[in-house]
């Protein structure tokens, strides 16, 4: 969705080559995570700040991840989760996983279900305060009711 066609073709070819390598060696190539998980500006800025604070942080992921994500579509299974409870938490300003995607999953999920849309946060801002406390509050309340 966020790649040009030629980039998509190149990524699929690299994934195919990596799949063949995994079949013969059991190993996957590691690449910079931004090659696979294209960040929005806010996410890129947060990641750069995190790397400055922790230069030893791992910034690579296996190419195998491409196959794992291309081959999975949550819309195919979300309606099969019920009657197990499912909590969707998204953020209003998420530009990586648009809130509409969570809303679509929620619409197709069976009960019990809940959708929380946090106001004013981007994708990775939910992992730090004050958003983190909101996420944990919703999560603990949900677990308290359904565990």
Language model segments and positions:
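Catalytic histidine-centered segment of alpha/beta-hydrolase-like enzymes
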Residues: 121-134
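Short beta-strand/loop motif that positions the catalytic acidic residue
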Residues: 81-82, 87-90, 94
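Conserved beta-strand scaffold positions in the cores of enzyme catalytic domains, especially
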Residues: 115-117
């Amino acid at each position: 969705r966020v790649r040009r066609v030629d980039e998509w073709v190149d990524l699929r070819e690299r994934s195919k080559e990596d799949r063949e390598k995994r079949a013969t060696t059991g190993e996957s190539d590691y690449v910079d995570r931004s090659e696979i998980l294209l960040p929005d500006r806010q996410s890129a800025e947060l990641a750069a700040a995190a790397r400055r604070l922790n230069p030893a942080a791992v910034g690579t992921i296996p190419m195998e991840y491409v196959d794992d994500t291309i081959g999975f579509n949550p819309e195919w299974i979300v309606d099969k989760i019920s009657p197990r409870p499912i909590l969707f938490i998204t953020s209003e300003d998420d530009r990586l996983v648009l809130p509409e995607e969570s809303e679509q999953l929620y619409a197709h999920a069976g009960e019990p279900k809940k959708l929380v849309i946090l106001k004013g946060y981007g994708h990775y801002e939910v992992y730090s305060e004050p958003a983190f406390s909101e996420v944990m509050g919703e999560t603990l309340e949900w677990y308290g009711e359904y565990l």
